[in-house]
Amino acid sequence: MAEKTEKPTAKKLRDAAKKGQTFKARDIVALIVIATGALAAPALVDLTRIAAEFVRIASTGAQSNPGAYAFAWAKLFLRIAAPFVLLCAAAGALPSLVQSRFTLAVESIRFDLTALDPVKGMKRLFSWRSAKDAVKALLYVGVFALTVRVFADLYHADVFGLFRARPALLGHMWIVLTVRLVLLFLLCALPVLILDAAVEYFLYHRELKMDKHEVKQEYKESEGNHEIKSKRREIHQELLSEEIKANVEQSDFIVANPTHIAIGVYVNPDIVPIPFVSVRETNARALAVIRHAEACGVPVVRNVALARSIYRNSPRRYSFVSHDDIDGVMRVLIWLGEVEAANRGGPPPETRAPTSAEPQARDGVAPLGDACADNAFPDDAPPGAAAPNAGSPDSPAPDGGAPARTGDQNA
């Protein structure tokens, strides 16, 4: 049998709590109940009033109406005892619920014949908990003896003064001295109570310890087989990413923000001259889109304002670019066409764009040539010279090669 060395898991503790196996410091609960009763007794118990009620009921006699006489006694008892009993019950129930974390042990209510097993009874008789209870009982005997000695030294004058006290004060003095004795006993027993709670907590976790095989089995039952779930997750991610990869590869360019948003734009003037949102991803997926686009040679334009505007105005993938963003998108397309033409060493291709998308100065916005001044070509530029920010700044792409199409464009 494997040695149980692993700490109990949260599920193990929850299952044990449903069976009634929870950490219970019963002596601390008893201390709270006794302290509550001792402190509440002087306020709730008035012996003078109780004696007067007894005299009144006894003087009426039971000959005339025995039923009413018995009912009067029962009513007096409930009126005296009910508040005190309810207060002590609440003081004991609340700590017990806190210790069990407000878990109701439903399974422990069922009748269990295994509890009558004599073998288990012998094991409990010679268990560590039985030894702990035996030592605790001896310590309580010593605590009680110490309490009596200290009480006698402190209040012996008050005890002997009871013989000379007036009858009206006798009951009150008895209650005060009893409360003092109880509180003194609880104070002396406090170290034993703390030690008992610590040992009980250790034994509780010791009984619920698990071996490594149990931990693995519990993980498989709660989370499922790790290898199967990982494989399913990988297959799902591959199926999910293939569609996005295809959309990225078919896009004319990717506009980024630069790391939190990635928008793919696709234009086919032969069908519809309006740009189309083919990819719309954020955060980690946006970074993956940018990396895949760079690997496939799809231009990546880092334009914060344009990326945010398209993301805000085009809330869904596979939708047309908003009218407010068409001008900016077409400026990027014209710029990319000029960059590709410059890398090939030929004239820029004719861009089939709507009239409203032609680069022009409007509302204080410079035309494309001014907005992308770093990418403009001087008149004396030699043929085949690469535009700045287009591809590698060290070596332009050779004729006929794939143009380097990643750059920064701030429209």
From Swiss-Prot:
<feature type="compositionally biased region" description="Low complexity">
    <location>
        <begin position="370"/>
        <end position="404"/>
    </location>
</feature>
<dbReference type="InterPro" id="IPR029025">
    <property type="entry name" value="T3SS_substrate_exporter_C"/>
</dbReference>
<feature type="region of interest" description="Disordered">
    <location>
        <begin position="341"/>
        <end position="411"/>
    </location>
</feature>
<keyword id="KW-0472">Membrane</keyword>
<dbReference type="GO" id="GO:0005886">
    <property type="term" value="C:plasma membrane"/>
</dbReference>
<feature type="transmembrane region" description="Helical">
    <location>
        <begin position="175"/>
        <end position="195"/>
    </location>
</feature>
<keyword id="KW-1003">Cell membrane</keyword>
<keyword id="KW-1133">Transmembrane helix</keyword>
<feature type="transmembrane region" description="Helical">
    <location>
        <begin position="137"/>
        <end position="157"/>
    </location>
</feature>
<keyword id="KW-0843">Virulence</keyword>
<dbReference type="Pfam" id="PF01312">
    <property type="entry name" value="Bac_export_2"/>
</dbReference>
<feature type="transmembrane region" description="Helical">
    <location>
        <begin position="28"/>
        <end position="48"/>
    </location>
</feature>
<keyword id="KW-0812">Transmembrane</keyword>
<dbReference type="InterPro" id="IPR006307">
    <property type="entry name" value="BsaZ-like"/>
</dbReference>
<comment type="function">
    <text>Part of the bsa type III secretion system, is involved in the intracellular replication of invading bacteria inside the host cell. Probably necessary for the lysis of the vacuole membrane and escape into the host cell cytoplasm.</text>
</comment>
<feature type="transmembrane region" description="Helical">
    <location>
        <begin position="80"/>
        <end position="100"/>
    </location>
</feature>
<comment type="similarity">
    <text>Belongs to the type III secretion exporter family.</text>
</comment>
<dbReference type="InterPro" id="IPR006135">
    <property type="entry name" value="T3SS_substrate_exporter"/>
</dbReference>
<protein>
    <recommendedName>
        <fullName>Secretion apparatus protein BsaZ</fullName>
    </recommendedName>
</protein>
<dbReference type="GO" id="GO:0009306">
    <property type="term" value="P:protein secretion"/>
</dbReference>
